[in-house]
Regions:
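TPR alpha-solenoid repeat register
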Residues: 65-66, 80, 113-114, 120, ...
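N-terminal leader/linker segments that initiate helical-solenoid repeat arrays
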Residues: 2, 21-83, 90-91, 110-111
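Canonical tetratricopeptide repeat
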Residues: 69, 76, 83, 116, ...
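Residue-level recognition of tetratricopeptide repeat
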Residues: 29, 62, 111, 158, ...
Length: 324
Protein backbone atom coordinates (compact mmCIF):
# COMPACT_ATOMS: atom_id res chain seq x y z
CA UNK A 1 0.00 0.00 0.00
CA UNK A 2 2.81 2.32 0.97
CA UNK A 3 4.68 1.56 -2.30
CA UNK A 4 1.52 2.26 -4.29
CA UNK A 5 1.10 5.65 -2.65
CA UNK A 6 4.73 6.54 -3.33
CA UNK A 7 4.38 5.53 -7.02
CA UNK A 8 1.19 7.54 -7.40
CA UNK A 9 2.85 10.55 -5.83
CA UNK A 10 5.80 10.25 -8.23
CA UNK A 11 3.52 10.08 -11.26
CA UNK A 12 1.66 13.15 -10.03
CA UNK A 13 4.91 15.05 -9.61
CA UNK A 14 6.11 14.08 -13.13
CA UNK A 15 2.78 14.98 -14.69
CA UNK A 16 2.75 18.32 -12.94
CA UNK A 17 6.35 18.95 -14.00
CA UNK A 18 5.67 18.08 -17.64
CA UNK A 19 2.56 20.26 -17.70
CA UNK A 20 4.43 23.18 -16.25
CA UNK A 21 7.31 22.57 -18.65
CA UNK A 22 4.89 22.57 -21.61
CA UNK A 23 3.26 25.72 -20.35
CA UNK A 24 6.66 27.27 -19.85
CA UNK A 25 7.55 26.94 -23.55
CA UNK A 26 8.16 30.34 -25.07
CA UNK A 27 8.47 31.77 -28.51
CA UNK A 28 12.26 31.65 -28.07
CA UNK A 29 12.05 27.91 -27.41
CA UNK A 30 10.03 27.49 -30.58
CA UNK A 31 12.56 29.54 -32.57
CA UNK A 32 15.38 27.34 -31.30
CA UNK A 33 13.43 24.23 -32.26
CA UNK A 34 12.65 25.74 -35.68
CA UNK A 35 16.33 26.46 -36.35
CA UNK A 36 17.29 22.98 -35.17
CA UNK A 37 14.81 21.46 -37.62
CA UNK A 38 16.22 23.60 -40.43
CA UNK A 39 19.73 22.37 -39.61
CA UNK A 40 18.57 18.76 -39.43
CA UNK A 41 16.98 19.05 -42.88
CA UNK A 42 20.47 19.24 -44.37
CA UNK A 43 21.20 15.64 -43.39
CA UNK A 44 17.92 13.98 -42.39
CA UNK A 45 14.83 15.24 -44.19
CA UNK A 46 12.51 12.66 -42.66
CA UNK A 47 13.64 13.52 -39.15
CA UNK A 48 13.43 17.23 -39.96
CA UNK A 49 9.77 16.88 -40.99
CA UNK A 50 8.96 15.25 -37.63
CA UNK A 51 10.81 17.99 -35.74
CA UNK A 52 9.11 20.75 -37.71
CA UNK A 53 5.73 19.22 -36.96
CA UNK A 54 6.72 19.43 -33.29
CA UNK A 55 7.48 23.12 -33.82
CA UNK A 56 3.96 23.62 -35.19
CA UNK A 57 2.55 21.97 -32.05
CA UNK A 58 4.72 24.19 -29.85
CA UNK A 59 3.51 27.29 -31.65
CA UNK A 60 -0.09 26.19 -31.27
CA UNK A 61 0.48 25.78 -27.52
CA UNK A 62 2.22 29.15 -27.19
CA UNK A 63 -0.60 30.89 -29.01
CA UNK A 64 -0.94 34.06 -31.03
CA UNK A 65 2.55 35.25 -30.20
CA UNK A 66 4.00 32.38 -32.25
CA UNK A 67 1.58 32.56 -35.19
CA UNK A 68 4.15 33.99 -37.62
CA UNK A 69 6.66 31.28 -36.75
CA UNK A 70 3.94 28.66 -37.06
CA UNK A 71 3.16 29.95 -40.55
CA UNK A 72 6.85 29.61 -41.51
CA UNK A 73 6.97 26.09 -40.13
CA UNK A 74 3.84 25.11 -42.02
CA UNK A 75 5.24 26.56 -45.25
CA UNK A 76 8.31 24.29 -45.25
CA UNK A 77 6.49 21.05 -44.48
CA UNK A 78 4.97 20.39 -47.97
CA UNK A 79 8.26 20.92 -49.92
CA UNK A 80 10.24 18.95 -47.35
CA UNK A 81 7.83 16.06 -47.53
CA UNK A 82 7.96 16.30 -51.34
CA UNK A 83 11.76 16.06 -51.16
CA UNK A 84 11.42 12.86 -49.13
CA UNK A 85 9.54 11.46 -52.12
CA UNK A 86 12.40 12.55 -54.38
CA UNK A 87 14.88 10.74 -52.12
CA UNK A 88 12.87 7.54 -52.45
CA UNK A 89 12.80 7.98 -56.23
CA UNK A 90 16.59 8.31 -56.31
CA UNK A 91 16.83 5.14 -54.23
CA UNK A 92 14.34 3.43 -56.59
CA UNK A 93 11.97 2.75 -53.70
CA UNK A 94 8.81 3.49 -55.63
CA UNK A 95 6.09 2.31 -53.20
CA UNK A 96 7.66 4.48 -50.48
CA UNK A 97 7.88 7.36 -52.95
CA UNK A 98 4.16 7.07 -53.66
CA UNK A 99 3.37 7.23 -49.94
CA UNK A 100 5.67 10.23 -49.49
CA UNK A 101 4.20 12.17 -52.41
CA UNK A 102 0.66 11.43 -51.26
CA UNK A 103 1.57 12.82 -47.84
CA UNK A 104 3.16 15.91 -49.41
CA UNK A 105 0.01 16.45 -51.46
CA UNK A 106 -2.12 16.26 -48.32
CA UNK A 107 0.17 18.76 -46.60
CA UNK A 108 0.08 21.04 -49.63
CA UNK A 109 -3.71 21.05 -49.53
CA UNK A 110 -3.73 21.68 -45.77
CA UNK A 111 -1.24 24.55 -46.03
CA UNK A 112 -2.43 25.98 -49.37
CA UNK A 113 0.73 25.24 -51.35
CA UNK A 114 -0.58 24.99 -54.92
CA UNK A 115 2.88 24.50 -56.41
CA UNK A 116 3.75 21.42 -54.34
CA UNK A 117 0.25 20.03 -54.80
CA UNK A 118 0.66 20.18 -58.58
CA UNK A 119 4.17 18.72 -58.48
CA UNK A 120 3.16 15.89 -56.15
CA UNK A 121 0.15 15.02 -58.30
CA UNK A 122 2.32 14.96 -61.41
CA UNK A 123 4.78 12.56 -59.76
CA UNK A 124 1.97 10.37 -58.43
CA UNK A 125 0.43 10.12 -61.90
CA UNK A 126 3.77 9.05 -63.38
CA UNK A 127 4.47 6.51 -60.63
CA UNK A 128 1.05 4.88 -60.85
CA UNK A 129 1.27 4.72 -64.64
CA UNK A 130 4.77 3.21 -64.47
CA UNK A 131 3.47 0.61 -62.03
CA UNK A 132 0.58 -0.08 -64.39
CA UNK A 133 2.97 -0.62 -67.30
CA UNK A 134 4.85 -3.22 -65.26
CA UNK A 135 1.57 -5.00 -64.58
CA UNK A 136 0.71 -4.97 -68.29
CA UNK A 137 4.05 -6.63 -69.00
CA UNK A 138 3.07 -9.27 -66.45
CA UNK A 139 -0.29 -9.68 -68.27
CA UNK A 140 -2.20 -8.47 -65.20
CA UNK A 141 -4.45 -6.18 -67.18
CA UNK A 142 -7.20 -5.49 -64.65
CA UNK A 143 -4.67 -4.56 -61.98
CA UNK A 144 -2.84 -2.40 -64.49
CA UNK A 145 -6.02 -0.55 -65.42
CA UNK A 146 -6.68 0.10 -61.73
CA UNK A 147 -3.23 1.69 -61.37
CA UNK A 148 -3.61 3.74 -64.54
CA UNK A 149 -6.92 5.12 -63.33
CA UNK A 150 -5.42 6.02 -59.95
CA UNK A 151 -2.72 7.97 -61.74
CA UNK A 152 -5.21 9.73 -64.00
CA UNK A 153 -7.22 10.90 -60.99
CA UNK A 154 -4.13 12.81 -59.89
CA UNK A 155 -3.45 14.21 -63.36
CA UNK A 156 -6.50 14.10 -65.67
CA UNK A 157 -4.42 15.65 -68.47
CA UNK A 158 -1.68 13.00 -68.52
CA UNK A 159 -1.80 11.79 -72.11
CA UNK A 160 0.68 8.94 -71.56
CA UNK A 161 -1.62 7.61 -68.83
CA UNK A 162 -4.61 7.48 -71.17
CA UNK A 163 -2.49 5.88 -73.89
CA UNK A 164 -1.20 3.21 -71.51
CA UNK A 165 -4.73 2.57 -70.23
CA UNK A 166 -5.97 2.21 -73.80
CA UNK A 167 -3.28 -0.35 -74.56
CA UNK A 168 -4.27 -2.38 -71.50
CA UNK A 169 -7.89 -2.42 -72.68
CA UNK A 170 -6.71 -3.48 -76.14
CA UNK A 171 -4.82 -6.39 -74.58
CA UNK A 172 -8.09 -7.36 -72.89
CA UNK A 173 -9.90 -7.22 -76.23
CA UNK A 174 -12.11 -4.28 -75.19
CA UNK A 175 -11.91 -2.09 -78.30
CA UNK A 176 -14.62 0.31 -77.14
CA UNK A 177 -12.67 1.22 -73.98
CA UNK A 178 -9.46 1.29 -75.99
CA UNK A 179 -10.93 3.90 -78.36
CA UNK A 180 -12.39 5.91 -75.49
CA UNK A 181 -9.01 6.21 -73.79
CA UNK A 182 -7.12 6.81 -77.03
CA UNK A 183 -9.46 9.71 -77.79
CA UNK A 184 -8.68 11.14 -74.33
CA UNK A 185 -4.96 10.63 -75.01
CA UNK A 186 -5.27 12.54 -78.29
CA UNK A 187 -7.14 15.41 -76.62
CA UNK A 188 -4.60 15.71 -73.80
CA UNK A 189 -1.55 15.27 -76.03
CA UNK A 190 -2.86 17.92 -78.42
CA UNK A 191 -2.96 20.41 -75.51
CA UNK A 192 0.57 19.38 -74.52
CA UNK A 193 1.75 19.56 -78.16
CA UNK A 194 2.93 15.96 -77.83
CA UNK A 195 2.83 14.96 -81.48
CA UNK A 196 4.29 11.51 -80.79
CA UNK A 197 1.36 10.45 -78.58
CA UNK A 198 -1.16 12.05 -80.96
CA UNK A 199 0.26 10.14 -83.91
CA UNK A 200 0.51 6.83 -82.04
CA UNK A 201 -3.02 7.08 -80.62
CA UNK A 202 -4.54 8.01 -83.97
CA UNK A 203 -2.72 5.14 -85.64
CA UNK A 204 -3.96 2.68 -83.02
CA UNK A 205 -7.61 3.72 -83.35
CA UNK A 206 -7.37 3.95 -87.14
CA UNK A 207 -5.82 0.50 -87.39
CA UNK A 208 -8.54 -0.98 -85.19
CA UNK A 209 -11.32 0.66 -87.21
CA UNK A 210 -9.68 -0.51 -90.43
CA UNK A 211 -9.63 -4.11 -89.20
CA UNK A 212 -13.27 -3.86 -88.17
CA UNK A 213 -14.15 -2.37 -91.54
CA UNK A 214 -12.43 -5.15 -93.47
CA UNK A 215 -14.12 -7.76 -91.27
CA UNK A 216 -17.50 -6.18 -92.05
CA UNK A 217 -16.66 -6.13 -95.77
CA UNK A 218 -15.79 -9.82 -95.71
CA UNK A 219 -19.23 -10.47 -94.20
CA UNK A 220 -20.79 -8.33 -96.96
CA UNK A 221 -21.92 -5.80 -94.36
CA UNK A 222 -21.04 -2.95 -96.70
CA UNK A 223 -22.74 -0.10 -94.83
CA UNK A 224 -20.85 -1.00 -91.66
CA UNK A 225 -17.64 -1.38 -93.65
CA UNK A 226 -17.98 2.11 -95.15
CA UNK A 227 -18.73 3.60 -91.72
CA UNK A 228 -15.72 1.95 -90.10
CA UNK A 229 -13.31 2.72 -92.92
CA UNK A 230 -14.35 6.36 -93.16
CA UNK A 231 -13.92 6.61 -89.38
CA UNK A 232 -10.39 5.22 -89.76
CA UNK A 233 -9.66 7.92 -92.33
CA UNK A 234 -10.87 10.45 -89.77
CA UNK A 235 -7.88 9.41 -87.63
CA UNK A 236 -5.49 9.91 -90.57
CA UNK A 237 -5.14 6.16 -91.05
CA UNK A 238 -4.66 5.70 -94.79
CA UNK A 239 -3.57 2.60 -96.66
CA UNK A 240 -4.01 1.52 -100.25
CA UNK A 241 -5.90 -1.59 -99.09
CA UNK A 242 -8.31 0.53 -97.04
CA UNK A 243 -9.09 2.66 -100.07
CA UNK A 244 -9.62 -0.40 -102.26
CA UNK A 245 -12.06 -2.02 -99.79
CA UNK A 246 -13.82 1.33 -99.35
CA UNK A 247 -14.19 1.71 -103.12
CA UNK A 248 -15.55 -1.81 -103.49
CA UNK A 249 -17.98 -1.32 -100.57
CA UNK A 250 -19.27 1.94 -102.02
CA UNK A 251 -19.81 0.29 -105.38
CA UNK A 252 -21.81 -2.45 -103.66
CA UNK A 253 -23.96 0.28 -102.09
CA UNK A 254 -24.28 2.07 -105.46
CA UNK A 255 -22.41 5.08 -104.10
CA UNK A 256 -20.50 5.49 -107.33
CA UNK A 257 -18.93 8.91 -106.86
CA UNK A 258 -17.58 7.87 -103.45
CA UNK A 259 -16.25 4.65 -105.00
CA UNK A 260 -14.38 6.57 -107.71
CA UNK A 261 -12.89 8.96 -105.14
CA UNK A 262 -11.70 6.12 -102.87
CA UNK A 263 -10.24 4.11 -105.77
CA UNK A 264 -8.32 7.13 -107.06
CA UNK A 265 -6.88 7.74 -103.57
CA UNK A 266 -5.73 4.12 -103.37
CA UNK A 267 -4.32 4.32 -106.88
CA UNK A 268 -2.09 7.22 -105.85
CA UNK A 269 -0.57 5.10 -103.08
CA UNK A 270 -0.02 1.98 -105.19
CA UNK A 271 3.09 0.88 -107.05
CA UNK A 272 2.51 2.00 -110.63
CA UNK A 273 2.58 -1.31 -112.51
CA UNK A 274 -0.32 -2.69 -114.53
CA UNK A 275 -0.84 -5.72 -112.29
CA UNK A 276 -0.85 -3.58 -109.13
CA UNK A 277 -3.13 -0.80 -110.39
CA UNK A 278 -5.65 -3.10 -112.10
CA UNK A 279 -7.90 -3.55 -109.06
CA UNK A 280 -8.40 0.20 -108.63
CA UNK A 281 -9.19 0.76 -112.30
CA UNK A 282 -11.66 -2.11 -112.09
CA UNK A 283 -13.56 -0.40 -109.24
CA UNK A 284 -13.48 2.92 -111.10
CA UNK A 285 -14.83 1.18 -114.20
CA UNK A 286 -17.62 -0.48 -112.19
CA UNK A 287 -18.61 2.90 -110.78
CA UNK A 288 -18.77 4.52 -114.23
CA UNK A 289 -20.75 1.55 -115.49
CA UNK A 290 -23.18 2.05 -112.62
CA UNK A 291 -23.47 5.72 -113.58
CA UNK A 292 -24.15 4.60 -117.18
CA UNK A 293 -21.04 6.44 -118.36
CA UNK A 294 -20.00 3.79 -120.89
CA UNK A 295 -17.07 5.73 -122.35
CA UNK A 296 -15.28 6.11 -119.01
CA UNK A 297 -16.26 2.59 -117.98
CA UNK A 298 -14.63 1.12 -121.12
CA UNK A 299 -11.52 3.26 -120.72
CA UNK A 300 -11.00 2.08 -117.17
CA UNK A 301 -11.81 -1.58 -117.85
CA UNK A 302 -9.01 -1.50 -120.44
CA UNK A 303 -6.62 -0.26 -117.75
CA UNK A 304 -7.91 -2.99 -115.43
CA UNK A 305 -7.41 -5.86 -117.90
CA UNK A 306 -4.25 -7.22 -116.26
CA UNK A 307 -3.40 -10.05 -113.90
CA UNK A 308 -6.26 -11.36 -111.76
CA UNK A 309 -8.64 -8.77 -113.27
CA UNK A 310 -7.94 -9.51 -116.94
CA UNK A 311 -10.70 -12.03 -117.58
CA UNK A 312 -13.41 -10.04 -115.78
CA UNK A 313 -12.44 -6.76 -117.48
CA UNK A 314 -12.14 -8.26 -120.96
CA UNK A 315 -15.57 -9.84 -120.60
CA UNK A 316 -17.00 -6.42 -119.75
CA UNK A 317 -15.22 -4.81 -122.70
CA UNK A 318 -16.20 -7.40 -125.31
CA UNK A 319 -19.47 -8.94 -124.19
CA UNK A 320 -21.24 -6.65 -121.73
CA UNK A 321 -20.46 -3.08 -122.74
CA UNK A 322 -19.26 -3.96 -126.25
CA UNK A 323 -16.68 -1.22 -126.07
CA UNK A 324 -15.54 0.29 -129.37
Amino acid sequence: MKKTLILAFAVTILTTFNTKNLQAQTKDDAILAFNAAIELSKTDMTGAVVKMQDVVKMCTTIGKEADTLKMKANSVLPPWQYNIGNEFINAKKYPQAIAAYEKSRDMAIAYSDANIKEKAESMLAKLYVNDGNSLVNAQKYDEAISQFEKGLKYDPNYSKGYYANAMAYKKKGDNAKMKENMDLAIASATKENDTIIVKAAKNMIGSSLNQEGIAAYNKKAYTEAVTKLNAALGYDFKTKDLYYVLASSNNSLKKYDEAIEAAKSGLEMEVQTNDKTARYYCEIAKAYEGKNDIGNACANYRKAAYGAFAQFSNDKIKNVLKCQ
